Amino acid sequence: NSAKAGLSFYKRLAIVLALGLIGGYWFYFKLGMDSVSLPFIEEWQIGFWLVPLFVLVMVALFSSGVIDGLDGLSGGIMAIIFAAYTGIAYFQSQIDLAAFCAVVTGGILAFLWFNIPPARFYMSETGILGLTTTLTVVAFLTDSVFTLPIIALPLLITSLSVIIQLLSKKIRGRKVFLVAPLHHHFEAIGWPAYKVVMRYWVIGIICGLIGMILTLISKF
């Protein structure tokens, strides 16, 4: 039965939570990481709270997978984010990590070649889970957890638009957006899909540059 194909939401969430706990445990107990950097502020010692923070970031990023709704949208945004982290890792002298992020960026661009309209295949949650898990690890390795919301702002606003829509329908009994996630709202008001995608890319590039600069400046 195709309607029952794939994992349920709760099973997928359980996988993400398990990966988050494993990753948080590794960073805290194996790598000895117990603090995070805030832009223009000294290191913030959070101790064991780093583990739930890791889980929270991973779940938040995975929830942003709803951005995979238009041809070229998720691939373009993910490529921009990993390109920004290529620069961050390079200027932090983490050359191996920079090379890894560059390879991921290249892989996404290869995917994007076949995903631009009309898409021949799609990222879906299989790709989103791999990329968001990797992005969580990269954000902690570069100590940029608190600039990640800027670097990945298109992902953030996509998730928030769904949350706002659901809360508004439950509390107020009406919708804020014509359709959620936000990119479908723009389609509903008359924007062609290519315009939505390209404007998201432009916003993504701007946010990636700003986030990269803030991350690097905060280290000096």
Model-derived regions: residue spans:
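Membrane-interface helix termini and inter-helical loops of multi-pass transporters
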Residues: N1, L31-E43, K219-F220
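Membrane-interfacial loop-to-helix junctions in multi-pass inner-membrane proteins
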Residues: N1-A14
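Mid-bilayer segments of alpha-helical transmembrane spans in multi-pass integral membrane proteins
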Residues: L13, L17-F29
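Alpha-helical transmembrane segments
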Residues: F27-F29, I46-F220
